[in-house]
Amino acid sequence: MTQDKCPFKEQSSQPNFAGGGTSNKDWWPDRLKLNILRQHTAVSNPLDADFDYAAAFNSLDYEGLKKDLRALMTDSQDWWPADFGHYGGLFIRMAWHSAGTYRVFDGRGGAGQGQQRFAPLNSWPDNVSLDKARRLLWPIKQKYGNKISWADLLILTGNVALESMGFKTFGFAGGRPDTWEADEATYWGRETTWLGNDARYAKGFSGSDKRGSLIADEESHKTTHSRELETPLAAAHMGLIYVNPEGPDGNPDPVAAAHDIRDTFGRMAMNDEETVALIAGGHTFGKTHGAAPADNVGKEPEAAGLEAQGLGWANKHGSGKGPHTITSGLEVTWTKTPTQWNNNFLEYLFKFEWELTKSPAGAHQWVAKNADEIIPDAYDASKKHKPTMLTTDLSLRFDPAYEKIARRFLEHPDQFADAFARAWFKLTHRDMGPRARYLGPEVPSEVLIWQDPIPAVNHPLVDASDIAALKDEILASGVPPRSFISTAWAAASTFRGSDKRGGANGARIRLAPQRDWEVNNQPWLREALSALEAVQSRFNARGDSKKVSLADLIVLAGCAAVEKAAQDAGHPIKVPFVPGRMDASQEETDVQSFNHMEPFADGFRNFAKGPARPRAEHYLVDKAQLLNLSAPEMTVLVGGLRVLNTNYDGSTHGVFTSRPGALTNDFFVHLLDMNTAWKDVGNGELFEGSDRKTGGKKWTATRADLVFGSNAELRAIAEVYASNDGDMKFVKDFVAAWNKVMNLDRFDLKGKQTIPARL
């Protein structure tokens, strides 16, 4: 009897296994990315279903953890030695690069999910050697287990690093539950080579196949002073956090580099003062690494062999570590005290004149002219070096606006320290959302405008009888129910699960800039707000101490209108409502910051701005992902909002019903009706449905409507709601999804912190 051979060919590269082979994405690369609505669910989470991260964090020996982190800073390991005997610079970079991927346009990126552990971030060229930083932390993470998430630990370690080198931080807040899989929703750009930027800029670079090195370009590029970065990106190159430290596309021009710095830092919510503080403060510590050319550097973690165990960038130069380390290809130590907080960076920036040179790896950098060798070597106490700087460091001197700030910081170290402390806190907490999510003993008491503050509840809340009476009064106001539904949706759907901003709490729908957004139907909005303000005034004028906020009334009115719509459809149902929202003031609202949240498109309301944009159905899925919705939840909400007649402009596109305003499943029934034939009547954006026999016009629709009959997966869901037994299920599911959206920002109600479920 012969021995059976393994069906898998030895060392075969043929992916003839589950998940291998040519995929749907390969055949149809432009297909709708519904997979982003199936991420970060209980299926991928190894923790128990009832695990409460907030409770776990609050039981943490916080001071013991910080003590262990402080000890680690100077506990140099042979397998990855500490520069200058202190890991502070490495851990500051780790925390900075964890948080620094955040961008204002969609709130994605940032430190909130610990995504630096996963592809692509774990293998970005800008994150070389951070794999070692996280492994240095593993014994501490192992000790404290699930009481501290990786997401929180990466940031706290950066704080402790600063404190261990004499800097007083502004504070720290925990509250970042981990995710357990690589994020597929964030758009990082279209380039297919590391360090490329030829897709995000009209005239960019094609990139490089080198590892552990940036691009050096001798040529001058006129467009770098005025080029415009693709939205929503906030990095100048694929695989970089912000900008190329050698200068734009490797061109060592500090003035041109300032343009890229201002653009990218601005897209991360930083103004000029915060930008100068972060660069000067961060570069007070540590060094860069470029001991030899990039040819010595091996594959990144995602491409390295199994034996590397998740580490990457193996370096064959010398020992491959310590004095032989290659990270960026730059070899710069900014100050003579790289493990102490002081003003040396700014002092040297203005004290010396600088001349262009190259690192041992061939990267552009600058060296002080006619300067003494005052900079210590990271590993040899007998060696000294001349001061060195990056091109982007010199931008703080040669850009007029940056120079003014930098000189003020030089002359007023106290202002510099305060600005850096605040900017660092903002950098590392910008994507955490409201203060209600903050955990731990070091949460600063000062309320900051970028936290989108909302006053605390300071009065008794309405009870069940009050709610019933208020609903009756609202529905008797004479305002069409669709105005209340539209206003409630407009308020609540500003929420972004990415950075936890937006939502109905605060009633900012009545304030600038939201009240003026094109997507928010102005007549309907004014009509609804006017009626609700009158209801609020009458209720709050009563003799008792109970009060109702406008934010609560906006949501309550939407709920009441949905209940009426369900009743009119023959399916009475109670829509849940929990009071406790408060009203923010205009002074508590950063208009510029909220402007970034104005949608280019909102398929839930059939809104799309301008022709130069992705297709409406892709924006619809993007919006659904930001709302933490599943594909079924997105589907049922669109179908319900259409029959409720809530298109932003009052149009009838997608209103496939003879009973607009009633919460029926008519949208799905008529969309899937094979007696209707569809044709394009608006350049692929508008469609007309006609009777197949008579040719008579029946409906009009947008891409955000027809996708539910066109896309195979969405059609499968639509069929459930279009079936004869699907009408009541449709109403129940719509109410559940509606309630979810209305409460996405109610962190005050959520007794535990988890990744929001998509059901």
Swiss-Prot record:
Binds 1 heme b (iron(II)-protoporphyrin IX) group per monomer. One of its GO terms (biological process) is hydrogen peroxide catabolic process. Heme b binds at residue 283. Keywords: Cytoplasm, Heme, Hydrogen peroxide, Iron, Metal-binding, Oxidoreductase, Peroxidase. Its EC number is 1.11.1.21. There is a cross-link at residues 96-242 (Tryptophyl-tyrosyl-methioninium (Trp-Tyr) (with M-268)). One of its GO terms (molecular function) is metal ion binding. It catalyses: H2O2 + AH2 = A + 2 H2O; 2 H2O2 = O2 + 2 H2O. It is an enzyme of class 1 (oxidoreductase). Its cofactor is heme b. The active site is at residue 97. InterPro entries: Catalase_peroxidase, Haem_peroxidase, Haem_peroxidase_sf, Peroxidases_AS, Peroxidases_heam-ligand_BS. One of its GO terms (cellular component) is cytosol. The keyword Cytoplasm applies. Residues 1-24 are annotated as: Disordered. Not glycosylated. CDD domains: catalase_peroxidase_1 (cd00649), catalase_peroxidase_2 (cd08200). Sensitive to heat and heavy metals. It is found in: Cytoplasm. The record marks 93 as: Transition state stabilizer. Bifunctional enzyme with both catalase and broad-spectrum peroxidase activity. May be involved in protection from the host during host infection. Belongs to the peroxidase family. Peroxidase/catalase subfamily. PANTHER family: CATALASE-PEROXIDASE (PTHR30555:SF0), HYDROPEROXIDASE I, BIFUNCTIONAL CATALASE-PEROXIDASE (PTHR30555). HAMAP family: Catal_peroxid. Monomer. This is Catalase-peroxidase.
